[in-house]
Each structure stands twice: as structure tokens, then as C-alpha cells.
């Protein structure tokens, strides 16, 4: 009886594997003969612009500014700035952009700019929570600092890290409610 069950199970497995193989070959070799354009947007930007999905649209950012667009291409908001190396962080409906090795960071939501933080030390990393609070790793001569900023860009707290003490942070992350820093 056990050998009969084993044979039936083996046959079923072989049939399933064969079906998966045949379907994957058909999909891989399918030749599309036409397409339909459902929407298009003209891009009139510089080559250094980068795009990233955000909320129910996308964000375009570069050294000169950041803009939020709906998927239809309609501009919702636009903010100019001057950054050498902009880096973005997204969490839910909040986005932060900071000038890496610079000293400014901006916080936005789907309605526009919420806050701006100016630092006295170079920014190494930026993270944002869903509520718009920002955490930044800052570089000093003998230490690094992890600063938390509220939605308006005001510093909430600062944690000093040294190589001989806690070590330098390689990466940070904050929870969506900004209550946990890792």
C-alpha cells in the first residue's frame, strides 16, 4: 500500500513539474505583436534628474530641486534648493531630501514642504518617518552624531557616537512613527 501511494505521489509531482515547465516555456517564447500606449508624459528635465515612486505618483529630484507629480504628469508641488549630492528617503506619505556631505535637509509630504533642518556638520545619511520626522547621521572630527528632527526641522535630540565608545553608525533606520531608532 505504501509503495502504491509513493508511486502516485511521484507521478503527481512529475505531472506538476512538467506543467510548470511547459507553461514557463510558452510564456518565455510568447511573441507580442502589438502594444497600446495608455499614457505618456513629456520629460523636459536635465540628465541628472532622478525619479522615485512616491505616494500615488512620483518624485523627480536633482541638484537644483525636487518636484512631486501625479502619475498623470500633473505637478503637485515643486521646491528649489541647491545641493551637491541630494539623497532621498521615503516612508509612507513623507519624503526627506538631504545634501550628503552638505548641511541641509528638507521634509515633505504629499501637500508640499513641511520643514527644513540646517546642520552645523556634514550630513552622511538621512532617514524619514511616516510622520515626517527626520533622523540624520552627522560627521564631526572625532565623533558622529545621530540627530532627530521634528516635522518643522527643529532638533529633538542628538546622540554622540565615537569609535572608541559605541562605534560609528554604518546605517540607521527609524520606525514609521519615529519612536524607534536602529
Language-model features, listed with the residues they occupy:
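Repeated scaffold domains used in trafficking and secretory/extracellular systems
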Residues: 44-53, 82-93, 121-132, 166-173
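N-terminal Lys/Arg-rich, disordered targeting/topogenic segments
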Residues: 1-5
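Hydrophobic beta-strand positions that form the internal "hydrophobic ladder"
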Residues: 58, 95, 134-135, 178-181
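A short beta-strand motif characteristic of beta-propeller blades
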Residues: 31-44, 73-80, 112-118, 155-163
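Structural motif
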Residues: 65-67, 103-106, 142-148
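Hydrophobic membrane-insertion alpha-helices, especially the h-region
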Residues: 7-24
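Extracytoplasmic/periplasmic C-terminal soluble domains
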Residues: 142-182
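Extracytoplasmic/periplasmic/luminal assembly and interaction segments
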Residues: 50-101
Amino acid at each position: 500500500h505504501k509503495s502504491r501511494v509513493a508511486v502516485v505521489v511521484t507521478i503527481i509531482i512529475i505531472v506538476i513539474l512538467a506543467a510548470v515547465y511547459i507553461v514557463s516555456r510558452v510564456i518565455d517564447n510568447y511573441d507580442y505583436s502589438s502594444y497600446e500606449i495608455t499614457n505618456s508624459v513629456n520629460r523636459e528635465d536635465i540628465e541628472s534628474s532622478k525619479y522615485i515612486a512616491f505616494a500615488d505618483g512620483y518624485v523627480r529630484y536633482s541638484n537644483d530641486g525636487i518636484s512631486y507629480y501625479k502619475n498623470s504628469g500633473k505637478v503637485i508641488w515643486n521646491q528649489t534648493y541647491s545641493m551637491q549630492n541630494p539623497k532621498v528617503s521615503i516612508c509612507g506619505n513623507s519624503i526627506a531630501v538631504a545634501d550628503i556631505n552638505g548641511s541641509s535637509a528638507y521634509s515633505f509630504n504629499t501637500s508640499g514642504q513641511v520643514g527644513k533642518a540646517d546642520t552645523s556638520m556634514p550630513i552622511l545619511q538621512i532617514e524619514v518617518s511616516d510622520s515626517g520626522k527626520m533622523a540624520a547621521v552627522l560627521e564631526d572630527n572625532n565623533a558622529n552624531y545621530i540627530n532627530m528632527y521634528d516635522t518643522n526641522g527643529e532638533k529633538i535630540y542628538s546622540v554622540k557616537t565615537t569609535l572608541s565608545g559605541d562605534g560609528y553608525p554604518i546605517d540607521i533606520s527609524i520606525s514609521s512613527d519615529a519612536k524607534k531608532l536602529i
